[in-house]
Design a protein with these regions (language model features):
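Single conserved hydrophobic/aromatic residue that forms the stacking wall/gate
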Residues: 1-8, 226-230
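A conserved ligand/cofactor-binding region detector
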Residues: 9-227
Length: 230
């Protein structure tokens, strides 16, 4: 079971993380982009902590292209952003150092250097990437080495700032922001279907553009035959 888990994790990192990072750099090179300005050409969104290994992997790949560690960290920080969807444990992964040593031995030295760099910014042990029990905190790495940390609802973001990630918020207040999750009709209706938008405006006015509750006025036209295209 352990070996299968190791193989599965290694394949995940190779196929999803490393291949993705390599594709980004390959496309960047094909377009004549300067790797030193990667953030001007690419944006990597880390959704929860499952893709967190893209941070050390991208640093490793940039190092192979002759970029020094300190600059690679700066480039990756500008390129990557982190979204936290929930404070539940499955979204705040922690992996034993020994496990990562077995799965990604080439990345552990980079993670250790990132941990050392993070410790120069704060003496708070609870914000370290590698804790006293030799566990690697993926969310901690994400917050330290991305330029943005967002929650997905106003209340959720306030909980992150004032409770669950309060120490990080005190250290990096400028990084924290909210991006409400979900689908907005303003995109799939107003932007994507102007003909339907015009039809609705003909029958119920334009108030629904700012107030979705105005769409309830359509209930007066449920016969379908009453609605006509503009």
């Amino acid at each position: 079971e352990i070996s299968c888990s190791l193989v599965g994790s290694e394949m995940c990192i190779r196929d999803r993380v490393s291949a993705g990072a390599q594709l980004i750099l390959a496309e960047c090179a094909a377009r004549g982009c300067n790797f030193h300005d990667l953030a001007d050409y690419a944006a990597i969104q880390i959704n929860d902590t499952h893709p967190s290994m893209v941070i050390p992997e991208l640093i490793r790949l940039l190092g192979q292209r002759g970029i020094e560690f300190e600059e690679a960290v700066e480039i990756v920080t500008k390129t990557c952003a982190y979204t936290n969807h929930t404070i539940l444990a499955e979204a705040l992964e922690k992996w034993p150092r020994a496990y990562l040593d077995a799965v990604v031995p080439q990345l552990m030295p980079i993670i250790e250097k990132l941990d050392a760099l993070a410790r120069t910014r704060t003496e708070d042990e609870s914000l370290a990437i590698i804790d006293k029990d030799d566990r690697v905190h993926m969310a901690h790495m994400d917050i330290h080495f991305t330029h943005s940390t967002n929650g997905v609802a106003a209340l959720h973001t306030e909980i992150l700032k004032n409770s669950e990630l309060h120490g990080f918020y005190e250290l990096y207040p400028e990084k924290f922001n909210n991006k409400t999750n979900g689908i907005t009709f303003r995109r799939w209706l107003l932007e994507c279907d102007p003909l339907l938008t015009a039809t609705l405006e003909k029958h119920i006015g334009s108030g629904f553009r700012k107030d979705a509750a105005e769409l309830e006025k359509l209930l007066a036209s449920v016969s379908y035959t009453h609605l006509t295209l503009p």
